[in-house]
From Swiss-Prot:
A Pfam family of this chain: POTRA_1
Locations listed in the record: Cell membrane
Taxonomic superkingdom: Bacteria
Domain POTRA: 156-226
Key words, A-Z: Cell cycle, Cell division, Cell membrane, Membrane, Transmembrane, Transmembrane helix
Biased composition (Basic and acidic residues): 35-65, 75-119, 364-388
Name by which UniProt lists this protein: Cell division protein DivIB
Gene3D superfamilies, A to Z: 3.40.50.10960, membrane protein fhac (3.10.20.310)
Xref: PROSITE patterns: POTRA (PS51779)
Biological process, per Gene Ontology: FtsZ-dependent cytokinesis
Membrane topology of the entry: Single-pass type II membrane protein
Ranges of the Cytoplasmic topological domain: 1-133
Amino acid sequence: MSKDKKNEDKETLEELKELSEWQKRNQEYLKKKAEEEAALAEEKEKERQARMGEESEKSEDKQDQESETDQEDSESAKEESEEKVASSEADKEKEEKEEPESKEKEEQDKKLAKKATKEKPAKAKIPGIHILRAFTILFPSLLLLFVSAYLLSPYATMKDIRVEGTVQTTADDIRQASGIQDSDYTINLLLDKAKYEKQIKSNYWVESAQLVYQFPTKFTIKVKEYDIVAYYISGENHYPILSSGQLETSSVSLNSLPETYLSVLFNDSEQIKVFVSELAQISPELKAAIQKVELAPSKVTSDLIRLTMNDSDEVLVPLSEMSKKLPYYSKIKPQLSEPSVVDMEAGIYSYTVADKLIMEAEEKAKQEAKEAEKKQEEEQKKQEEESNRNQTTQRSSRR
């Protein structure tokens, strides 16, 4: 027996050497646990035997004492003793069942220990707050790096600029007015859109401008030009008058003129602005009926103008009151049977063109008569002066 024990001890030592420290600790723990369970089982067995002895002694004492009692009491005592015996047997059975269960638990613990040695330890999870802090630092840094790299690259100044809506102007004129340079950053155009749109509107032809961006580098300048409302005529030259009240300084070719247009025979900048402003308040039908506008100041009204209509009618109206008084012409027109003059200087009345010619002829005759009288008076004065001079010379010669 001693040899067998020695051999077993040697084998266990060799196994312990081969095992890792953790496995050694695990085996030691399992051995201790098995020893403790065996000790507990022995204590339980001793307690059970002691209980059985006490119960048997008590039952004997009771039997002696109860021998004098009725038969019914003896039967009940027997039943109680039988129940106790049955309970003791049940305790034995439970203990017998617990022993294999404890062995099974030991085997399961060994298996779990082996699995734990094979499995790798689980990685600790990173708390969410640390991830959030790292994100708040890394994201701005990466964004700044990306923006810096973009600004240093040639893509930062790459632009494809197109112009739409030009009729009287050219795309080059619009680009020049915008002030956009090849060296300007694309991001500056996006951030300062309003500034560039305002610069484009510095071109007097442009009524409105819109700078539209399309990814990645395309820009479209959408332009709306002022309309041409009339032409200032000087000899054979025609200068456009815009709806803004601006008079174009360069004339247009006769081939580019529309079939019908409004002719203006004065070029004062303030008067043209007032005329365009008043004209904008008149209906399109009445505008289309006007053929020519010229100044016709009188002694009473300095800004009186004469409008020659397409049907040969003439309208005299103050320039500052044109939008108020001219619409009445549409009501008077059906009453005119022949070309007439509608005078709106003070009140409204009309007369025929023939009467006008007669009146003009009479006025011319009066003016000519006045001029003739003036000439006669001047000649008489000259003659009197000459006669006076002659008399003075004669007197001086006599002396």
